[in-house]
Amino acid sequence: MRFRVDGVLYNQNRFSDFLEDHYNAVSTRLKIMCNANISERRLPQDGAIPFDVEKGIDLRVNFLPTHGGSERVVMRILNKKGLSVKLEQLGLDEKNGLDKLLSAVNAPQGMVLITGPTGSGKTTTLYSLLSTINKEGINILTAEDPVEYALEGIGQVQVRDDIGFGFGSALRAFLRQDPEVILIGEIRDKDTVEIAVKAALTGHLVFSTLHTNDSPSSITRLIDMGIPPYLVSSAVSLVMAQRLARKNCSHCSKVQEGVTVEQLVDLGFSTEEASAVKPQKGKGCGKC
């Protein structure tokens, strides 16, 4: 068993002996708790477990068949309290373009894209953006895979590729539902991006995500998917790339020697900022 904390995997050896003897039983029990098929061990399965109703914590569970007949189980912790996080609490400020983001979010139409690797907090940012504009008189629809959090006052739709109801099909239906705002969980194919661009150009505010390393790459990706450059420039209002940066422990971090100004500039600091910054590194302690 391993836990991923702040992007780093840690072994939990105290469970090793128990899981070695009872792994299949634990896997079956988890399937029962999340209403998965306990007899299916050939195909991947997904499920959800309400973990702590009072605190609003749920578990998203994925079962993956592996060689030898066993299954790999991954559980993701979802905290509904994260929905109430304000944009300022996500580390966004005027220096990081918060004013530009708010301007794009409050526009009557256009496309706002959030990019970054898996697990970089794109969904949390999108939900925070929706919370910012979720007011009476605004019709908001979302197409997600899966629907991770229930949002009050927002129409959320679970896409089902297995029955032919993908993001593209959901978007076509949305355009007949008279929405002001549309959220697409992810732009994956040409069909989806074509409808999303059409929506952004016809009086709708569209939010979505892309898996690219930086903001400029998102424009290239849209063009590679078949959208003419003149439509991209007309439809896209803003692209924001984000990462989750680990914080140093305030109890054990110390100034890290040997970091040059050139290295800090390569990380995105200006020359003036790099000259004033004193990089620190945590050593690890009981507090962290």
Give a label for each model feature.
Residues 7-9, 19-20, 55-56, 64-68, ...:
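Conserved nucleotide-binding/hydrolysis micro-motifs of P-loop NTPases
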Residues 1-120, 125:
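N-terminal "pre-motor" subdomain/linker immediately upstream of P-loop NTPase catalytic cores
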Residues 16-23, 91-94, 120-123, 189-190, ...:
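Conserved phosphate/pyrophosphate-binding and hydrolysis machinery centered on Walker-type P-loop NTPases
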Residues 102-112, 123-246:
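Switch/coupling sub-region of P-loop NTPases
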Residues 212-288:
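Cys/His-rich Zn2+-binding cysteine-cluster or related metal-binding knuckle/ribbon modules and their
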Residues 8-10, 31-38, 54, 64, ...:
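Non-catalytic alpha-helical coupling and interface elements of nucleotide-dependent molecular machines
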Residues 7-8, 155-157, 266:
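Short glycine/proline- and charge-enriched loop/turn segments
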Residues 2-4, 48-50, 58-62, 74-76, ...:
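Structured core elements
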